[in-house]
């Protein structure tokens, strides 16, 4: 058991970027999920379309880029903390698995939400595409919560 671990100063910036991108990713996923959920629950067509558009844009402009930055930063800090040739602890695998799967789900949710926005502009309503995008964004939040657990508890 490690009681105190002091990192070299050269690790601080990549770790700060990794943690900041993770926090922004979770925040963007939650904001998008709330907007998409409210779009489904709103009875006014104009309000539902605006919420749907906001949720899709939040996914596109914030969540997906932060997921990419998170993965790049994770590799950067892993290369410093665990150089090639050393074995990675189990929590690193949990982190990669959850980060990559949440990125995939967020990209699919972004595509579906954007298609739902396009359908609503054509007057076809939001429909099943929006429900699927909402479900995938909620699933990605659950996966990101697992990642937060793995990164804070660091199970072996």
List the model feature ranges, each with a label.
Residues 1-156:
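Polytopic transmembrane helical bundles with strong interfacial aromatic enrichment
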